[in-house]
C-alpha cells in the first residue's frame, strides 16, 4: 500500500470506528448499514460528489455545507451525518471511500457476515451462487455475501477471495502451473 493510501486508510479507520461505536450505542446499526449502502451508491454515481470530496478548490465551509446538504437530502443517520461534517471541517473528506469500506466491514463483522469476492469465467446461476455461499458459510461459520464478477480470460473455474484467503480453481491458473512444471523438467 502506498504511503498516501495508508494514511487515508488510517484516517478513515479512526472515523469509521467512532461512527460505528456511536451508531452501536444508539442501536442504529441497521440504519447505518442502509446509509453506507446509499452513500456508496451516491459516490459511485455522482462525479460532482467525488469532485467535492477530493478537490482542494473547495473551502472547509463549502465542503461542510455541501456534505450537510447531501446528508440531509439522503436522510443519513446522526452519527454518520455528524461524522461527515466533522471530516469536512478537518479537510478529511478525501478519505470517504475508505471510511465507507471500513464501516461496511465493521457492520458485517457485527452481524456475523463476511463478503466473498468471486470471479468466474462465466456468470454463476442463482443455484450455483447459493450453493457456493452455503459452502463458504459452512467453512466460516458466518453468513457469506457474494460479490460476483465475470472474467472470461480465466477460461473456466473461479477465484474466491474470502478475507485473507484466496482459492483459485481456474483453468488459467492450472495451465500456468503446468507450464511452470514443464519448464522445470525440460
Curated annotation (Swiss-Prot):
Localization per record: Cellular chromatophore membrane
User: Does the UniProt entry include the keyword Magnesium?
Assistant: no
Please classify the protein's predominant subcellular localization into one broad category.
membrane
Record's Gene Ontology CC terms?
plasma membrane; plasma membrane-derived chromatophore membrane; proton-transporting ATP synthase complex
Q: How does it sit in the membrane?
A: Peripheral membrane protein
According to the UniProt entry, where is the signal peptide? none
Q: Which GO terms describe its molecular function?
A: proton-transporting ATP synthase activity, rotational mechanism
The organism's superkingdom is given as Bacteria
**Alphabetical keyword list:** ATP synthesis, CF(1), Hydrogen ion transport, Ion transport, Membrane, Transport
Please report which protein family the annotation says this sequence is part of: Belongs to the ATPase delta chain family.
User: What's the stated role of this polypeptide?
Assistant: F(1)F(0) ATP synthase produces ATP from ADP in the presence of a proton or sodium gradient. F-type ATPases consist of two structural domains, F(1) containing the extramembraneous catalytic core and F(0) containing the membrane proton channel, linked together by a central stalk and a peripheral stalk. During catalysis, ATP synthesis in the catalytic domain of F(1) is coupled via a rotary mechanism of the central stalk subunits to proton translocation.
> Assembly and partners?
F-type ATPases have 2 components, F(1) - the catalytic core - and F(0) - the membrane proton channel. F(1) has five subunits: alpha(3), beta(3), gamma(1), delta(1), epsilon(1). F(0) has three main subunits: a(1), b(2) and c(10-14). The alpha and beta chains form an alternating ring which encloses part of the gamma chain. F(1) is attached to F(0) by a central stalk formed by the gamma and epsilon chains, while a peripheral stalk is formed by the delta and b chains.
Q: What is this protein called?
A: ATP synthase subunit delta
Q: Which organism is it from?
A: Rhodobacter capsulatus
> Gene name, please?
atpH
Amino acid at each position: 500500500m502506498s504511503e498516501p493510501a495508508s494514511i487515508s486508510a488510517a484516517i478513515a479507520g479512526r472515523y469509521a470506528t467512532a461512527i460505528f461505536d456511536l451508531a452501536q450505542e444508539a442501536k442504529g446499526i441497521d440504519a447505518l448499514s442502509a446509509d453506507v449502502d446509499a452513500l456508496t451508491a451516491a459516490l459511485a454515481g455522482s462525479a460532482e460528489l467525488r469532485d467535492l470530496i477530493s478537490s482542494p478548490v473547495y473551502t472547509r465551509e463549502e465542503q461542510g455545507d455541501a456534505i450537510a446538504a447531501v446528508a440531509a437530502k439522503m436522510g443519513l443517520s446522526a452519527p454518520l451525518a455528524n461524522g461527515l461534517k466533522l471530516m469536512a471541517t478537518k479537510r478529511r473528506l478525501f478519505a470517504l471511500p475508505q471510511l465507507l469500506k471500513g464501516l461496511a466491514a465493521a457492520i458485517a463483522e457485527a452481524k456475523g457476515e463476511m463478503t466473498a469476492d468471486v470471479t468466474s469465467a462465466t456468470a454463476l446461476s442463482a443455484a450455483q451462487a447459493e450453493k457456493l455461499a452455503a459452502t463458504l458459510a459452512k467453512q466460516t461459520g458466518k453468513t457469506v455475501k457474494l460479490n460476483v464478477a465475470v472474467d472470461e480470460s480465466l477460461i473456466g473455474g473461479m477465484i474466491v477471495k474470502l478475507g485473507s484467503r484466496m482459492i483459485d480453481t481456474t483453468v488459467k491458473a492450472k495451465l500456468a502451473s503446468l507450464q511452470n512444471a514443464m519448464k522445470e523438467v525440460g
